[in-house]
Amino acid sequence: ADGDIERTDKWGFREALMRSFRRRKIFPDHVLFMTEDAVRWQPPAESMHIKGLAFRDLEFDGDPGQPASADELVRQAHALGKFVTNPKHAECFRLVAPAGKLPTGVIQASPALVQSIRVTRRAAPDGRVLFDLVGEVTQSCTVDRKGVLYDVNGGCTVVIDPEGKVRYSIYKKFDSQQRQERQLAAMRGPLKRFWKKSGRRFELRDNVLRRLHGGNR
């Protein structure tokens, strides 16, 4: 994200950050080389503009960080939700559109929910300020893995520029077989005290936060 406001890294900030991760042997999954090109977010394969979410269409209460009203926030959320769940675009955000084809292993997908939408700002070293609109969308699905049912949460963070163009979609995929396997292994192993099995389905136990913060008691 820093590369959006300082493309050349002339102060060596990003290189120093990556070097510190390499030195400690901390590497992101599926990244073969710890280089700037390998770890930076990639834009969508196709150019997408969301109607009604360009800055000229937004209403503010004086400051760009303050929406004009709750109704304006709802309007923005509806515009985002309608776009990302459109069957033409849903795959780009790794969401399941209403009545859309389910990914392999998924037997049911709940409607996607826009959890938040807000303006962000970042200051460049030369004093410029970069504005974006950031929306968070979640979706839950039920996976059937060898007769065992459990829910997997997914969704995406959508970064939209002042012209309403989608700059980034950072997502969690439902159709990742490795992710499904890792979650099932965790529910049966190190996280089993948070889950119970009812018939074929794994379900979260009551008072999960209390169990989490209460240690092994």
Model region roles, listed by residue range:
Residues D2-R217:
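Non-catalytic terminal regions of proteins
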